[in-house]
Amino acid sequence: MEGYSEANALQFSQEQASSLGWKSYGDPEYVPHVLRYYSVGDSFGRFFGNQQIVAIAKNQLGNEGGQKFWSWWGFTERKEWCACFVSWCAEQAGLLQNGVMPKFAYCPDGVDWFKAHGRWKDGKAVPMTGATIFFDWNGDGISDHVGIVERVENGTVYTVEGNSGDVVRQNGYYIGSDTILGYSSCLLIK
């Protein structure tokens, strides 16, 4: 079991019940109920949400073609899938269900949501682990690509991105690079 999630809490409860010879252990609705009341800026959210979305994203490294992500989103044929990947990871980490992040398949829709919810920082900011990073490859002010911040180290932001050459891979960019449009700040900016 890695990270803290509703699924992991349920698994723990089932293991405890089995080891004790009981039908059930604990309240299966406790974790989802409690998670609804944590604000996105508190230490609980920063630790569990940020680390968890990164761990989920890293577990997908090497996935080619992204069918798992774009079909989860509801598409019946391949589409550009970087935003589907980020949304899928957010859903797996419980961030969609808690209203921390939107489900989006088009990068500008994600940018618009974070801006509308006061959760946007420009590309010169220093992100925290788990932030959503939006890119503008051609300098037109419109996001072309999105990924998840893995970590920041020595002036470089390291990411996990879906649809980076049609695969989930890790990349690195200098903080303040002109190609970084901005970041979500749902949990997430220092």
Name these PLM-found stretches.
Residues M1-E2, V34, A55-L61, S87, ...:
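Short, functionally critical alpha-helical segments immediately adjacent to catalytic or ligand/cofactor-binding
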Residues L96-D166:
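...with weaker cross-activation on analogous glycine-rich loops/strands in unrelated enzymes
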Residues D42-N98:
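N-terminal capping segments
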Residues P32, V40, G139, S143-K190:
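Aromatic- and glycine-rich peptidoglycan recognition patches
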Residues M1, K23, W70-W81, W120-K124:
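A glycine-rich, coil/turn loop motif that links secondary-structure elements
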